[in-house]
Amino acid sequence: MAKEKIRIRLKAYDHRILDQSAEKIVETAKRSGATVSGPIPLPTEKTVYTILRAVHKYKDSREQFEMRTHKRLIDIVSPTPQTVDSLMRLDLXSGVDIEIKL
């Protein structure tokens, strides 16, 4: 596993939980002897929903809701077998979506 790289993408609606999870992953990887680059903040995806406040008419009266998806990227450059094993056992908070590419 000398030339391989592990790329971890994290997504969450709450940036505080996302940063805590990223720090746990970086700390675990560094403790097992791997070289880590990140967490790199990626652009926040913002989705806006516009709805009418009234049921029947009054189109001028609208309300907008937004949903923000925060993203982080972590690259583990030289993972050891111990790194992969410790990352598999890592317990992260709920609400964080994790994509791992080897």
UniProtKB/Swiss-Prot annotation:
Q: Does the entry feature the keyword ATP-binding, yes or no?
A: no
GO MF entries? structural constituent of ribosome; tRNA binding
Q: Which UniProt keywords apply?
A: Ribonucleoprotein, Ribosomal protein
**PROSITE patterns in UniProt:** RIBOSOMAL_S10
Q: Which InterPro entries match?
A: Ribosomal_uS10 (IPR001848), Ribosomal_uS10_CS (IPR018268), Ribosomal_uS10_dom (IPR027486), Ribosomal_uS10_dom_sf (IPR036838)
Does the keyword Transcription regulation belong to this entry? no
One of the GO BP terms on file: translation
Q: Which GO terms describe its cellular component?
A: ribonucleoprotein complex; ribosome
Recorded hits in Pfam families, A to Z, give: Ribosomal_S10
Q: Please give the function described in this protein's UniProt entry.
A: Involved in the binding of tRNA to the ribosomes.
Q: How does it assemble?
A: Part of the 30S ribosomal subunit.
Q: Which family does it belong to?
A: Belongs to the universal ribosomal protein uS10 family.
Supply the PANTHER family for this chain: 30S RIBOSOMAL PROTEIN S10 FAMILY MEMBER
Name-wise, this protein is Small ribosomal subunit protein uS10
Q: Which organism is it from?
A: Bacillus cereus (strain ATCC 10987 / NRS 248)
